[in-house]
């Protein structure tokens, strides 16, 4: 659902920022 999409998007952003 939308929540899953947002969760994945946030996870990608967090990984990008942490790297």
From Swiss-Prot:
GO terms for cellular component: extracellular region. Has antibacterial activity against the Gram-positive bacteria L.lactis (MIC=25 uM) and S.uberis (MIC=50 uM). Lacks antibacterial activity against the Gram-negative bacteria E.cloacae and E.coli, and against the Gram-positive bacteria B.cereus, E.faecalis, L.innocua, M.luteus, S.aureus and S.epidermidis. Inhibits the formation of NO by neuronal nitric oxide synthase with an IC(50) of 2.4 uM. It comes from Crinia deserticola. It comes from the Eukaryota. This is Deserticolin-1. It is found in: Secreted. One of its GO terms (biological process) is defense response to bacterium. Keywords: Amidation, Amphibian defense peptide, Antibiotic, Antimicrobial, Secreted. Expressed by the skin glands. The modification Serine amide is found at residue 19.
């Amino acid at each position: 659902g939308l929540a899953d999409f947002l969760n994945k998007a946030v996870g990608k952003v967090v990984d990008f920022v942490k790297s």
